[in-house]
Amino acid sequence: ALMADKTFNLQIISPTRVLFDEAVDMVEMKTTEGEIGVLAGHIPLTTILEPGVLRIKTDGNVREAALHDGFVQIQKDKVTVLAESCEWPDEIDANRAEKAKERAERRLTSGSKEVDMVRAELALKKALIRIDLAGKH
């Protein structure tokens, strides 16, 4: 029964809106250091997030969101994710993501300046995350 109290407040905020603000059991995300799973009482930490899938677990339910760049601030009983952009699977337009993937691949094969390569690779990574997530739901 004690474990039941082990929730914490998770807030996911993007520049345009608050996507999520409720009590959760666990959140998993991808940081520059690798995947982390945060439970209640985690040590305070502020770290940069990589583009990836953010997984929220509450009462055995799992919700996933595609997160693109941002950072997370972990406090004793609260976790705040500030994301450049974050989308729920049902908001992801799979066709748009496919097109973005094609565009990114074209840019990668055209092989222009270095800077563009990095940007194109990132765009490709984002598109693939979106396609992956949209395909699962």
Regions found by a protein language model. Give the residues of each.
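Acidic/glycine-rich phosphate/pyrophosphate-binding loops and surrounding catalytic core
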Residues: 87-137
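A general secondary-structure signal for short beta-strands and their flanking turns/coil
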Residues: 5-7
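Short, Lys/Arg-enriched N-terminal segments with co-localized hydrophobic residues
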Residues: 1-3
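Compact, glycine-rich, soluble single-domain proteins
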Residues: 9-103
